[in-house]
């Protein structure tokens, strides 16, 4: 299949987890992919290798999306190596759950810098090159709708991302650039394992409330990104697709 043949995509935070899955899925549909990483070059290289072994095309590019110069560098890598940009997936994100009494200024600024400022800076760099038919996909969270306890800062960033998605859909619509978000529920990734969520009472509570009876997998989210990146979704913009197995 080649829904994205000839297209060029940038996926931020793609060295593992949801970002890695999306990068692989876009490449499998024919896109050339810039696999961005902040610190894990080895992880990004592994994603690039997996794409190459499957017959796809990708490069790994380092950069901190919360820094304007780095955001420009990431986008410029797509132009330098592939000559164009069609798809931007703003996936980079951090999370730390804590009760309100434990929230710190450092936690607030770090989370907002990556989850919100990073999206703005990378999008700012990308729109210089995106043309008619371009697609921006923001990876939000079901947390913005479900507002779980002990997630004040993280959920605030994802609420901001929902708002940014709506604003940019209106702002960029006249240029025929679409902007949508995917809002996953809990997904099994390296991060949710490291954070102690997998196997926890929190996971069990979520599963009990989920109509489809399990937490998500990366392979549940990546096809949604392919849909939003492709012409199959040409009449969708400003949408927030809740990919959570029915949990809301």
Feature map (PLM): residue ranges:
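A glycine/serine/threonine-rich, flexible loop-to-helix segment
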Residues: 45, 174, 185-210, 220
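Residue(s) in the substrate-gating loop at a strand-loop-helix junction
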Residues: 141
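Substrate-binding pocket helix/loop in short-chain dehydrogenase/reductase
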Residues: 99-100, 104-109, 206
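Conserved glycine-rich cofactor-binding loop
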Residues: 8, 15-17
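C-terminal helical subdomain
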Residues: 181, 201-232, 236, 243-245
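Active-site helix of classical SDR
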Residues: 123, 157
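Alpha-helical segment proximal to the catalytic Tyr-Lys
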Residues: 128, 170-174, 234
């Amino acid at each position: 299949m080649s829904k994205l043949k000839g297209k060029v995509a940038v996926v931020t935070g793609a060295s593992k987890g949801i970002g890695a899955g999306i990068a692989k899925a876009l490449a499998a549909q024919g896109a050339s992919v810039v696999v961005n990483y902040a610190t894990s070059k080895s992880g990004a290289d592994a994603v690039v290798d997996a794409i190459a072994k499957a017959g796809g095309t990708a490069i790994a590019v380092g950069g901190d999306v919360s820094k304007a110069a780095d955001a420009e560098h990431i986008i410029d890598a797509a132009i330098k190596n592939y000559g164009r940009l069609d798809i931007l997936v703003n996936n980079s994100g951090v999370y730390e759950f804590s009760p309100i009494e434990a929230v710190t200024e450092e936690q607030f600024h770090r989370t907002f810098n990556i989850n919100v400022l990073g999206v703005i800076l990378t999008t700012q760099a990308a729109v210089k090159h995106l043309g008619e038919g371009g697609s921006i996909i923001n990876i939000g969270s079901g947390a913005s709708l479900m507002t779980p306890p002990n997630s004040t800062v993280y959920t605030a960033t994802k609420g901001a991302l929902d708002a940014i998605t709506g604003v940019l859909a209106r702002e960029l619509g006249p240029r025929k650039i679409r902007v949508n978000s995917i809002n996953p529920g809990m997904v099994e990734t390296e991060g949710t394992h490291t954070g102690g969520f997998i196997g926890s009472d929190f996971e069990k509570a979520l599963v009990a409330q989920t109509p489809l009876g399990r937490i998500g997998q990366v392979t549940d989210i990546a096809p949604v990104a392919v849909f939003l990146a492709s012409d199959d979704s040409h009449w969708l913009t400003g949408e927030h697709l809740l990919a959570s197995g029915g949990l809301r």
